[in-house]
C-alpha cells in the first residue's frame, strides 16, 4: 500500500460528516437494505438485511438489535457512529503515522464475540454502501478506495490484536 494522502483523509472526513448529518437514518441503512418500514410501530423489519442477511450469526453480536432494527434505538446509532468513527480515525492515523494501531480493547471484544473474516468483509460492504448513500452524487472510486483502505487497515489491526490475545 502506498502512503495514505491528505486528500484521502479529507475524503473520509467529509463523507463521515455526511454520514453523521443523518445518523439515525444511516445507522438503519448500515444494518438494513431494502427494508420494510412498519409505520405503526416505527420498526424496520429485518428483510434483505445488509449485515444479518449475509452473516446471520452476527445478530448475536449486536445485543441491541433485538427482533428488529429500531431507528429510535440510541444504541444502534451509537454503535454505527463508533464503527464509522473508528474507520475515520484509521484514515487519520494512516495519513499522520503511516500505520493503524487499534484500541487495546477491540481485539478481546471481537474475539469474545467470535467475529470471523467473513463478518469483517460483510461489515466492510455494508459500510461502503452506507457511505455511498450518505454522500450521494459525491461518491467516486477515489472516495470508495479511501474508505476501503482505512477499513482494511483497522480490520487488520483488530485481527492482529485478536491473534495476539488468543496466544495469551
From Swiss-Prot:
Residues 3-163 form the Globin domain. The modification Phosphoserine is found at residue 63. One of its GO terms (cellular component) is nucleus. Induction: Down-regulated in roots upon waterlogging and in response to drought in cv. Embrapa 45, but not in cv. BR-4. Nitrated in effective nodules and particularly in hypoxic conditions; this mechanism may play a protective role in the symbiosis by buffering toxic peroxynitrite NO(2)(-). Nitration level decrease during nodule senescence. Phosphorylation at Ser-63 disrupts the molecular environment of its porphyrin ring oxygen binding pocket, thus leading to a reduced oxygen consumption and to the delivery of oxygen O(2) to symbiosomes. O2 binds at residue 79. Heme b binds at residues 63, 82, 110, 113. SUPFAM superfamilies: Globin-like. Expressed in root nodules and flowers. It is found in: Cytoplasm, Cytosol; Nucleus. Keywords: Cytoplasm, Heme, Iron, Metal-binding, Nitration, Nitrogen fixation, Nucleus, Oxygen transport, Phosphoprotein, Transport. GO terms for molecular function: heme binding; metal ion binding; oxygen binding; oxygen carrier activity. Leghemoglobin that reversibly binds oxygen O(2) through a pentacoordinated heme iron. In root nodules, facilitates the diffusion of oxygen to the bacteroids while preventing the bacterial nitrogenase from being inactivated by buffering dioxygen, nitric oxide and carbon monoxide, and promoting the formation of reactive oxygen species (ROS, e.g. H(2)O(2)). This role is essential for symbiotic nitrogen fixation (SNF). Maybe involved in water stress tolerance. Monomer. Belongs to the plant globin family. This is Leghemoglobin 5.
